[in-house]
Regions:
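Pyridoxal 5′-phosphate
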Residues: 1-377
Length: 377
């Protein structure tokens, strides 16, 4: 099978990831829940993973790296932890439902939300965002890259704009962490939300958020933390403030191994390889008769994603044919990005998304190009 659905999850991981998970299952105790050897060793591994993530993302403090099950949970913690009735939020049409649905829910609770519109290429105009700020604007919540088109937003520019208006920036790095360099301080990010199972090449069930010192988030969950057990309130210090209950220590061990792999290969090299494959595929399909490709490919810096349609064929039928006849795995449909499909005019048809990873090859890309060519004839 040729797996080209890496924007959903990376199927092929560094071999040391599975080995680390297996070893943790056999040897890891409950981190921060004991003073015996297996608990302490698990605690050291968890803190080591926080430290590697802080270094990777330019987060000023490792203890401000909070673990979650995925980026959806991280975004819910950030969104529900920041906003109250009377606040105003700015977001964009590029967002995933992990941002949209919490914001829609908050609209029913007295929070006002404005969305920066996207054009037919999936781009926004930053001057449109500038006009939306109000005195009560508390934050911009936006993705770093569209999971449908691969277009990047200029996060540093958005963060600077938000800060100039006294607002925060919450960035969703689900599609960029591990493949696009991120520096919270340089890019003016106040809260960075990420998942571990995509570009970071870790196990499913891992993710988190990095929080700039001085940013206060209300806990979404409350419960055991292993510290201050006689207090009725959740501990105030990060990370315990937002980490109630036992962590996914086994998954974090796999993420730790994946981060070591990324450090060795470098984010720059991983991203360059993925984008080269993406560009090879794009160049091979963009001029095919009957094929429509979505997104802006004029910039070299983007996520390694190509979304397309073939004539008026239902995207699900195309994806089914790719898998049944060519053994190529892709993703069809709405991709949890309804506003983006509205902007692109693909609500009814959806789109077929090809997404590339560090472990894909040029031969796999060429096979996928040939398959699209045959289906379009």
């Amino acid at each position: 099978m040729i797996y080209l659905d890496n924007a959903a999850t990376t199927l092929h991981k560094p071999p040391e990831v599975a080995e680390a998970v297996k070893n943790a299952i056999l040897t890891a105790g409950n981190a921060s829940r004991g003073a015996h050897g297996v608990s302490l060793s698990a605690s050291r591994m968890v803190f080591g993973t926080r430290s590697r993530l802080a270094k990777l993302f330019g987060c000023p403090r490792a203890d401000h790296v909070v673990f979650t099950a995925n980026s959806t949970e991280a975004l819910n913690i950030a969104i529900y932890g920041l906003f109250s009735s009377g606040d105003h939020v700015i977001s964009t049409d590029l967002e995933h439902n992990s941002v949209l649905r919490p914001l829609y829910d908050l609209q029913t609770r007295g929070v006002s939300v404005d969305f920066v519109p996207a054009d037919r290429q999936g781009n926004i105009r930053y001057e449109d965002m500038e006009t939306l700020f109000r005195p009560e604007t508390k934050a911009v919540v936006c993705t770093h890259a569209s999971n449908l088109t691969g277009n990047l937003l200029d996060i540093a520019k958005i963060g600077a704009m938000a800060h100039a208006h006294g607002a925060l920036l919450v960035a969703d790095a689900s599609q960029t962490a591990g493949a696009v360099p991120i520096d919270m301080q340089r890019m003016n990010i106040d809260v960075l939300c990420f998942t571990g199972h995509k570009g970071l090449m870790g196990p499913q069930g891992t993710g988190g958020l990095c929080i700039r010192p001085g940013v206060e988030l209300r806990p979404l969950l409350r419960g055991g933390t292993g510290i201050h057990s006689y207090d009725r309130e959740q501990p105030q210090a990060y990370p315990a403030r937002l980490e109630a209950g036992t962590l996914n220590t086994h998954g974090i061990a796999g993420l730790h191994a994946a981060l070591k792999f990324i450090e060795k290969q470098t984010v720059q090299a991983i991203g360059a390889h993925e984008r080269a494959l993406m560009r090879r595929f794009y160049d091979g399909v963009k001029d095919l008769d009957g094929v429509t490709v979505y997104g802006d490919f004029s910039r070299s810096e983007r996520a390694a994603v190509v979304a397309l349609n073939i004539r008026d064929y239902d995207s699900a039928e195309v994806a089914d044919a790719l898998f049944a006849d060519y053994d190529i795995a892709t993703r069809a449909g709405a991709h949890c990005a309804p506003r983006m499909h509205e902007a692109l005019g693909t609500v009814q048809q959806g789109a077929v998304r090809f997404s590339f990873s560090y472990f894909n090859t040029e031969n796999e890309v060429d096979t996928a190009i040939a398959a699209v060519r045959e289906l379009s004839e």
